[in-house]
Design a protein with these regions (language model features):
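Alpha/beta-hydrolase fold catalytic core
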Residues: 1-38, 59-62, 102, 289, ...
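Conserved HGGG/HGGXW glycine-rich cap/lid loop of the alpha/beta-hydrolase fold
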Residues: 21-77
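Conserved loop-alpha-helix segment in the C-terminal half of the alpha/beta-hydrolase fold
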Residues: 56-57, 245-281
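Active-site loop/oxyanion-hole signature of alpha/beta-hydrolase fold enzymes
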Residues: 66-112, 129
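Gly/Ala-rich beta-loop-alpha elbow adjacent to hydrolase catalytic centers
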Residues: 111-119
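Flexible "cap/lid" loop of the alpha/beta hydrolase fold
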Residues: 130-171
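Conserved serine/cysteine hydrolase catalytic core
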Residues: 215-262
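Catalytic active-site module of serine/aspartate enzymes centered on a nucleophile-bearing elbow/loop
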Residues: 269-309
Length: 309
């Protein structure tokens, strides 16, 4: 019988102060006899609440810890320190968290999309941390700009549009006049029938998803969002090796990534890359997915690995 876990993420969230920045951290204790420590790193346009369902689900295998990333989930951005949210800075931040939180303990790392990109860069910059990792899981992650399968026109529009809005004045204008709840709601409603996050939702579910999208757009720093978009679209981590095997959860028909190319790049970086296809076809679970909704997303093989002592 599965133990009872609160469905309120606030019951597991605590303050976090790292590298001069205030944020939050989610920690769900595992079952008494499970000693595994799992570090969950969320991706782009995310928060602790967005991945709470996944954290709930995998906490059956051990204690799950998920920190905010600077500029995401309401955490103060690197700009407060006069720094940019570069991939290296994010990797350094994550390394500091791992060293502080886990010290000499072993850790399982699961990185979601951009979160896996950050985790990979951390392991490249801090190879000593790779020795602490017992299992490394990429959850629809990527490591190179060519992993994306956007059309060239769309790629260039996102690449240079994001670069423009990562500057202070354009970002301020967007935050002040564009990212307003009524306008966000109107935009999502107008494209709901063809938007991948919305089209399968009924009226009540659609409202819940849009309301949560509004929260995400409000709690994520717009400059950080845009600057990290540029980092993702220009990434190339294939120049340094990591002495670890990686298990990559892929989804069939991923609308963002070419799974074959992702696998090739993972094999360039890691000692071994094994692709395990999820039963779920979406790039990520819905933004309000519960632990029960998440369950089909994590393949049985990954579950068996996590279940081992």
């Amino acid at each position: 019988m599965r133990r009872k876990i609160s469905n309120n993420p606030d019951d597991y969230i605590e303050p976090l102060y790292m590298n001069g920045l205030h944020g939050r951290m989610l920690r769900i204790p595992g079952p008494p006899r499970k000693k595994r420590e799992i570090l969950l790193v969320y991706g782009h346009h995310s928060s602790l609440e967005r991945l709470f369902g996944l954290a709930q689900d995998i906490s059956r295998y051990g204690t799950v810890t998920m920190p905010d990333l600077p500029g995401f989930g309401g955490m103060e951005p690197f700009y407060k320190l006069g720094e940019k949210p570069s991939l290296d800075n994010l990797a350094d931040y994550l390394a500091a968290f791992v060293k502080l939180k886990y010290k000499r303990r072993r850790v399982t790392i699961m990185g979601m999309s951009m979160g896996f990109l950050v985790a990979t860069r951390m392991l490249q910059r801090y190879p000593e941390l790779a020795k602490k990792v017992d299992i490394l899981v990429s959850v629809v992650g990527f490591v190179h700009r060519d992993d994306f399968k956007f059309k060239k026109r769309n790629y260039l529009l996102m690449r240079y549009g994001s670069s423009f809005f990562s500057n202070f004045l354009p970002a301020w204008i967007a935050k002040t006049f564009v990212l307003r709840a009524p306008l966000i709601r109107l935009t999502y409603r107008s494209v709901a029938d063809r938007h991948s996050k919305m089209r399968d939702a009924d009226k009540n579910e659609l409202k819940r998803r849009i309301d949560f999208e509004i929260v995400l757009w409000k709690c994520n720093d717009i400059r950080t969002y845009m600057d990290t978009t540029v980092s993702m679209l220009t990434a190339d981590l294939c120049k340094e090796r990591v002495d670890l095997p990686v298990y990559h959860i892929a989804v069939p028909g991923d609308r963002y990534f070419d799974n074959k190319i992702v696998e090739q790049h993972l094999n360039v970086i890691y000692s071994k890359a094994e692709v395990i296809v999820s039963k779920v076809s979406a790039h990520a679970p819905t933004i309000i997915a519960t632990a029960e909704d998440i369950e089909p997303f994590v393949p049985p093989k990954i579950r068996r690995m996590l279940a081992k002592a």
